[in-house]
Regions:
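A common structural junction motif
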Residues: 122-123, 273-278, 375-383
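A short core secondary-structure module
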Residues: 196, 200, 255-278
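Acidic/His- and Gly-rich active-site-bordering loop/insert found
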Residues: 9-149, 171-175
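Short, solvent-exposed beta-strand/turn "edge" segments of beta-rich domains on protein surfaces
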Residues: 236, 257-259, 328, 345-350
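Short, solvent-exposed loop/turn segments at the edges of secondary structure
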Residues: 134, 176, 207, 228, ...
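An extended, acidic, His-containing surface patch that forms the Zn2+-binding/catalytic region
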Residues: 95, 99, 105, 111-113, ...
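Acidic/histidine-rich catalytic neighborhood of metal-dependent amide-processing enzymes
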Residues: 146, 152-232
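Short amphipathic alpha-helices in soluble, non-transmembrane regions
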Residues: 260, 370-378
Length: 484
């Protein structure tokens, strides 16, 4: 080794040592703020029981939304329960019924100010009872949980928002600005219910300072190396694409098969896509903010890694896609082949076969760019792409804005043991529709939930803790009452 090369290597080693030392110092400096206060308000045992019974009554109504159907019978039954349980809301708030989608307004003292809106959805996904411990629409209260479809997603949100407003109105509360409640009937099937509410605001020339929907929640161990509660506030939703990829051929009898049949070409395409995962990996500003926010609540090795994106960013881009699908979703467009079709008989080669791919475009590689990547591989196998639906990621809420800061403040006051941080959502909510009339769309469900409860939301044995439900009512009440 020549003296020049040795000097270069020595200099590089010195730079690396300095960089690691700076990273270690930064990791030591990153600390979660001390928060030893008690929650701002607690429900009494009587209130806690009442809240559980109200949610149970709502869960017992099977408001399952179905594509191509517009039967509001069960939704009207649910709304009758809500009128009974939240009398002050329906007596004092101005109700606009948009084909079952409810929009309620409590007028504020200053009619010139923009309002705030709390939202959720009345509909639930189907539940056939298979693998359920109890009837999915029993609303059973047992072992300090409310059991049933919609208990977590998201009748708990609707119940807590309406209950909070009902109590505030009963206490004579007069808000400084208009306060709205919006609840749709077809969120689970991406229906147009919430768009009717958005159209209402557009027609009247109204804007909102803040819109808050379901989304992130309060989870323990949300990320590896994070042994505490974290309140994840969804500030951005990834995009959504459904695309049908078709292969055409001459068909024929399976006894004399040609090469490269439609199914063979589709199989090769799917295999290559699964093997290469060809979408761009990047740490976007939103994900960077999420990691830096999470770092303060993590063990030292993870704090050093996520608290120093400037140094470890390239390493994270390699590691995260390999850690888990959950981690990969933060840094890349994800895709999954979900449907397929071909011949109608076992001995017939189809003249056309297809697969459907669902993609969730990242904010750094939008729907158009993600489709270009997919089409590049489809062209290789002489496949046609038919885009069924495509939309980009939502806008990102202003992380330095007053509304995000206020929500974090309320989380600190009501859940002092949970650190609040911005969160990138892989799934979708109705909230994105309100971007047309609101600059600060936040997605947060103030519910402490376990990983098991999170996994059960569209599966069997959906539950919510009774104490956690009560705490969420008090959160919404605190949030609305103290909004200036």
């Amino acid at each position: 080794m020549g003296p020049y090369i040795a000097a270069v290597l020595l200099a590089l080693a010195a730079v690396l040592v300095v960089a690691l030392a700076l990273a270690a110092v930064q990791a030591i400096r990153i600390k979660a703020p001390a928060n030893t206060r008690e929650p701002a308000d607690r429900a009494t045992p009587e209130e806690t029981q009442k809240y559980a019974e109200t949610l149970a009554a709502m869960v017992q109504i099977p408001t399952v939304s179905k594509r191509g159907e517009n039967d509001l019978t069960e939704f009207r039954r649910l709304q009758a329960v809500m009128r009974e349980r939240f009398p002050h809301v329906f007596e004092k708030m101005e109700l606009t019924d948009l084909d079952g989608n409810l929009l309620l307004r409590l007028p504020g003292k200053d009619p010139n100010r923009n309002g705030i809106l709390l939202m959720g959805h009345q509909d639930v996904v189907p539940a056939d009872g298979k693998d359920w411990k109890h009837d999915p629409f029993s609303g059973l209260i047992e072992n300090d949980v409310v059991f049933g479809r919609g208990a977590m997603d998201c009748k708990c949100t609707v119940m807590a928002e309406f209950q909070a407003m009902d109590e505030l109105i009963a206490e004579g509360y007069e808000p400084p600005c208009d306060v709205y409640l919006s609840t749709s009937v077809n969120e689970e099937i991406s229906g147009g219910g919430v768009q009717k509410a958005v159209a209402y605001f557009k027609e009247k020339g109204l804007r909102l300072d803040l819109c808050m929907d379901e989304g992130g929640a309060i989870m323990h161990g949300m990320l590896p190396g994070m042994p505490v509660w974290a309140a994840a506030v969804g500030v951005l939703e990834k995009g959504y694409i459904d695309v049908k990829i078709k292969a055409k051929g001459s068909g024929g009898h399976s006894s004399t098969p040609p090469k490269n049949t439609p199914i063979a070409r589709l199989s090769a395409f799917v295999t290559e896509m699964e093997k290469k995962h060809p979408f761009k990996v990047a740490i976007s500003p939103t994900v960077k903010a999420m990691f830096e926010g999470a770092a303060a609540y993590m063990t030292f090795p993870m704090r050093m890694l996520l608290g120093n994106i400037w140094l470890f960013g390239p390493l994270l881009k390699v590691l995260l896609p390999k850690v888990s699908p959950f981690a990969e979703a933060f840094v890349s467009t994800t895709f999954c082949f979900t449907m397929s079709g071909g011949s109608t008989a076992a001995n017939v080669i189809p003249d056309e076969a297809y697969v459907v791919c669902n993609l969730r475009p990242s904010e750094h590689q939008n729907a158009e760019e993600s489709l270009k990547v997919l089409k590049k591989y489809a062209d290789k196998y002489d496949l046609e792409c038919e885009v069924i639906i495509a939309r980009n990621a939502s806008n990102c809420a202003k992380l330095d804005g007053e509304e995000f800061a206020y929500l974090k403040q309320c989380i600190d006051e009501c859940y002092p043991d949970a650190g609040a941080l911005p969160y990138l959502m892989a799934g979708g909510t109705d909230c994105r529709q309100f971007e047309a009339v609101c600059d600060s769309c936040l997605r947060f469900c103030p519910i402490k939930m376990t990983q098991e409860q999170l996994a059960a939301m569209h599966a069997a044995n959906e539950t919510i803790g009774v104490p956690e439900l009560a705490a969420s009512v008090k959160f919404y009440k605190h949030f609305v009452k103290n909004h200036k």
